[in-house]
Amino acid sequence: TKFSPWLAQGCLSARYIYLQVLQYSNENPDCKGAKTLLTNILLRDFFYVMFFKHNIKYFRQGGVFNKKLICIKDFEALQTWISAQTEDDYINANMLEFANTGWMNSIGRQHVSQYLSKNMLVDWRIGAAYFESQLIDYDVCLNYANWAEKAGVGCNNAIEPTSLNMPAIKEQFYNYSDFRAILK
């Protein structure tokens, strides 16, 4: 939605968005996008509550429950990811958009963070710190909570994230002409 920079700066409240979208959703019950947005706003608040509950534990490699995690500090792999030189066009397109704008949609953020932490096995905190330095909508709670979730060390891990199924991701990717244009 690109509300995130406004939310991060306090110019717009999540409550206001929630109430407006809820009203729209009630008037247009078939709108799936409204339901998704409502869910994302609730998830945002969940991450805030969990971040304040667990506080500094979110910054540990093993996250809030101090899980054992296989990861490496591979700065060459990190640079490959940052410079959009991975083997995957979808990841590269998202990273190029991020480098050029300081913003990335939520699905892209989920995929690139999971790719770095699960496919490349790079310490998720390094990716989170990179995002912290680049995001135009940076929010400490949301950034670290989202990264921890995708690395499998957050609070909401009923299902352990695994490496991304890149063929399935690529199939979705090639349906979006915007990403193909970014790669040209």
Q: Where is each model-derived feature located?
A:
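C-terminal catalytic domain of photolyase/cryptochrome flavoproteins
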Residues: T1-K184
